[in-house]
């Protein structure tokens, strides 16, 4: 029997497949599209996702296909410098098209043995105490121990579960288009600069091969959220910029709204939700793909532990407990950003005030930490300030921390050399390293790099190990 069915082969599902296969979990990804995605809605990775790629040994692949930027302005386009003191070894944004991210994650998952079936869509599901039966659109049935819905904002899995998806409806729509233009680039650049003095939901950037990615406010709401036509794009360009730049030969046309919705629960028995199936929000700040990757990084090791038989009773539930509040905060900050992009007098007055505030380094850093997810700290109870945070990559006597965590296991980083994980050594590595660049005597790290315990007392460590790594063997 399959261990895990993943419905959806986008970045979240592919990341999760790699995480599960790292632990030997038999994984099948079902993707309804018959061929790989050729268009990139998202175009970058933030620091936390870059850390994830480093921790899994994938970063060099991504760096080879992306470009590093240290530029501010990610919060509602407010002009700001990139902070110099972010708590990460990867203090930059990696510009990389989503289509490349998906290709690299596909390569990683399949190298580890994940099976990806295209042209397959979940149409029904039934679960019992032992597993989940998924019915595909062609009538085929598959049985697995767990199923994870990574099938996007219009998730079939979420609908079949009957999970509520409360939130705010779309009030404004924006068109995205990769097109060619019939005017000089200098003309396009000049018009964009002039229009953006008042309309910040308008923009144009090179998209490769002579194409430009245009971002244009829609004129009203669509009835069915269907992709716009070239004629609609031209009308919206005329309404916003007074010209359509002679756009032609579109290779991609899409639209997005400013709706924000959050699934009421991420787990229903043996079925879980991740990525856009669990939360949707506007793309302001470029957080959506990154949020899904981090969902997968949180869930993967926990699901593997449940399948491996060593998961503590509440470990799978901690996925919802930890990731649901993170998504709620992202929904809040994207709502705030959309408000700051409004043309109405009230929001524009607030924007002018915010433009003054981001000149303060602490305010600027706070906003960037939100966008990049560096500020995320899971509520793991009382204790040292490090508990619940992801530990940045640090130098060790030999090598780096993230290099030591590429196997997806827990790690006791012990500067004292006096501690032991005997009884958990099949799940937790012990590195006694007095030269580690760590400001505490010892730290217990979960497989996702978050600090579960800090201290130097063996009895206290033994009291905390079972919470995340189950009973001793």
From Swiss-Prot:
Disruption phenotype: No visible effect on rifampicin resistance. It holds the Pfam family Rng_hyd_C. Coiled coil: none annotated. Its EC number is 1.14.13.211. Its cofactor is FAD. It comes from the Bacteria. GO terms for molecular function: FAD binding; oxidoreductase activity, acting on paired donors, with incorporation or reduction of molecular oxygen, NAD(P)H as one donor, and incorporation of one atom of oxygen. FAD binds at residues 12, 31-32, 41, 98, 122, 156, 276, 289-290. InterPro entries: FAD-bd, FAD/NAD-bd_sf, RIFMO-like. Keywords: FAD, Flavoprotein, Monooxygenase, Nucleotide-binding, Oxidoreductase. It catalyses: rifampicin + NADPH + O2 = rifampicin para-naphthoquinone carboxamide + NADP(+) + H2O + H(+); rifampicin + NADH + O2 = rifampicin para-naphthoquinone carboxamide + NAD(+) + H2O + H(+). Rifampicin binds at residues 43, 196, 285. PANTHER family: BINDING MONOOXYGENASE, PUTATIVE (JCVI)-RELATED, TRK SYSTEM POTASSIUM UPTAKE PROTEIN. Contains three domains: a FAD-binding domain, a middle domain, and a C-terminal domain. The middle domain forms a cap over the FAD-binding domain and is involved in binding rifampicin. Monooxygenase that can modify rifampicin, thereby inactivating its antibiotic activity. It constitutes a secondary rifampicin resistance factor. Homodimer. Belongs to the rifampicin monooxygenase family. This is Rifampicin monooxygenase. It comes from Nocardia farcinica (strain IFM 10152).
């Amino acid at each position: 029997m399959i261990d895990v069915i993943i419905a959806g082969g986008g970045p979240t599902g592919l990341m999760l497949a790699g995480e599960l296969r790292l632990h030997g979990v038999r994984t099948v990804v079902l993707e309804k599209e018959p061929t790989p995605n050729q268009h990139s809605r998202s175009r970058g990775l933030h620091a936390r996702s870059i850390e994830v790629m480093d921790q899994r040994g994938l970063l060099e692949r991504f760096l080879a296909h992306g470009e590093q930027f240290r530029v501010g302005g990610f919060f509602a386009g407010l002009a700001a410098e990139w902070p110099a003191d972010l708590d990460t070894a990867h203090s930059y944004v990696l510009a990389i098209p989503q289509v490349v991210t998906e290709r690299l994650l596909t390569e990683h998952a399949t190298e580890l043995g994940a099976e990806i079936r295209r042209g397959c869509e979940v149409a029904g599901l039934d679960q019992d105490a032992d597993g989940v039966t998924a019915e595909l659109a062609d009538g085929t049935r598959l049985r697995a121990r767990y199923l994870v819905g990574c099938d996007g904002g219009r998730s079939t899995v979420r609908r079949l579960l009957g999970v509520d998806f409360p939130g705010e409806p779309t009030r404004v729509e924006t068109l995205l288009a990769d097109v060619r233009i019939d005017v000089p680039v200098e003309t396009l650049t000049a018009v964009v600069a002039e229009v953006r003095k008042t309309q910040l939901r308008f923009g144009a950037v090179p998209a490769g091969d002579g194409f430009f990615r245009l971002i244009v406010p829609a004129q009203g709401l669509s009835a069915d959220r269907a992709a716009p036509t070239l004629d609609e794009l031209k009308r919206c360009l005329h309404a916003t910029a007074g010209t359509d730049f002679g756009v032609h030969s579109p290779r991609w046309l899409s639209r997005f709204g400013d709706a924000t919705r959050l699934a009421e629960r991420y787990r229903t028995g043996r079925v879980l939700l991740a990525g856009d199936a669990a939360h949707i929000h506007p793309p302001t700040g470029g957080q959506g793909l990154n949020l899904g990757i981090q969902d997968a990084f949180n869930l993967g090791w926990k699901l593997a532990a449940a399948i491996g038989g060593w998961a503590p009773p509440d470990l799978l539930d901690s996925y919802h407990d930890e990731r649901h509040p993170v998504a709620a905060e992202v929904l809040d900050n994207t709502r705030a950003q959309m408000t700051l992009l409004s043309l109405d007098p009230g929001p524009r007055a607030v924007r002018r005030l915010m433009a003054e505030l981001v000149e303060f380094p602490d305010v600027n850093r706070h906003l960037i930490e939100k966008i990049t997810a560096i500020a995320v700290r899971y509520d793991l109870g009382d204790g040292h300030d490090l508990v619940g945070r992801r530990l940045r990559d640090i130098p060790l006597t030999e090598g780096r921390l993230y290099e030591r965590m590429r196997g997806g296991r827990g790690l006791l980083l012990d500067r004292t050399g006096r501690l032991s994980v005997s009884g958990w050594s099949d799940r937790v590595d012990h590195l006694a390293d007095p030269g580690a660049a760590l400001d505490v005597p010892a730290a217990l790290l979960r497989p996702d790099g978050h600090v579960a315990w800090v201290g130097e007392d063996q009895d206290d460590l033994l009291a905390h190990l079972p919470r995340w790594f189950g009973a001793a063997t």
